[in-house]
Curated annotation (Swiss-Prot):
GO molecular function: endoribonuclease inhibitor activity; enzyme binding
Domain of life: Bacteria
Role according to the record: Globally modulates RNA abundance by binding to RNase E (Rne) and regulating its endonucleolytic activity. Can modulate Rne action in a substrate-dependent manner by altering the composition of the degradosome. Modulates RNA-binding and helicase activities of the degradosome.
Organism of origin: Salmonella choleraesuis (strain SC-B67)
Protein's recorded name: Regulator of ribonuclease activity A
Major localization listed first in the record, in broad terms: cytoplasm
Family: Belongs to the RraA family.
GO-annotated biological processes: negative regulation of RNA catabolic process
Protein localization: Cytoplasm
Keywords recorded for this protein, A-Z: Cytoplasm
Cellular component terms per the entry's GO annotation: cytosol
Cited Gene3D superfamilies: Ribonuclease E inhibitor RraA/RraA-like (3.50.30.40)
Gene from which the chain derives: rraA
InterPro entries in the cross-refs: RraA (IPR010203), RraA/RraA-like (IPR005493), RraA/RraA-like_sf (IPR036704), RraA_gpbac (IPR014339)
């Protein structure tokens, strides 16, 4: 499904929170949306592998990487895993790498920046926790919609036809 965050903001202005414009699109899908699963991890993506092995249909993995752009939390291998398991998208408050490969995958990926250095894989982090960045507080179960214009969040799914 294609989402237009500008149109959604016009319709649901009182019901959505708008994330500050910190993110760029790195995935092959320009718009995406779904129910979020939150993760908090810093320069370590081991936990992301565990989560992305699950069925992601209708879901978006939202990762608070502390805004670090020193190590990429998502690379082509991890994004392929997410695509294979039907995740709608990834929002990374941190960095990604192998961007040419990411652009070829049918998944939405929004992140702050790209850097060639990969993350540790020790599995240090937490999932299903409250995270805050970009002026918005996120909870697992909230609904996120993203496109090249921005990212918005709603507690409940928006009625989109």
């Amino acid at each position: 499904m294609k989402y237009d965050t500008s149109e959604l903001c016009d319709i649901y202005q009182e019901d959505v929170n708008v994330v500050e414009p910190l993110f760029s699109n790195f995935g092959g899908r320009s718009s995406f949306g779904g129910q979020i699963i939150t993760v908090k991890c810093f320069e370590d993506n081991g936990l992301l592998y565990d989560l992305l092995e699950q069925n992601g249909r209708g879901r978006v993995l939202l990762v608070d990487g502390g805004g670090s752009i020193r190590r990429a939390l998502v690379d082509a291998e991890l994004a392929r895993l997410a695509t294979q398991n039907e995740w709608e998208g990834l929002v990374i408050y941190g960095a990604v790498r192998q961007v040419d490969d990411l652009e070829e995958l049918d998944i939405g990926i929004q992140a702050i920046a790209a850097i060639p250095v990969g993350a540790a894989g020790e599995g240090i982090g937490e999932s299903d926790v409250r995270v805050n960045f970009g002026g918005v507080t996120f909870f697992s179960g909230d609904h996120l919609y993203a496109d090249n214009t921005g990212i918005i969040l709603s507690e409940d799914p928006l009625d989109i036809e």
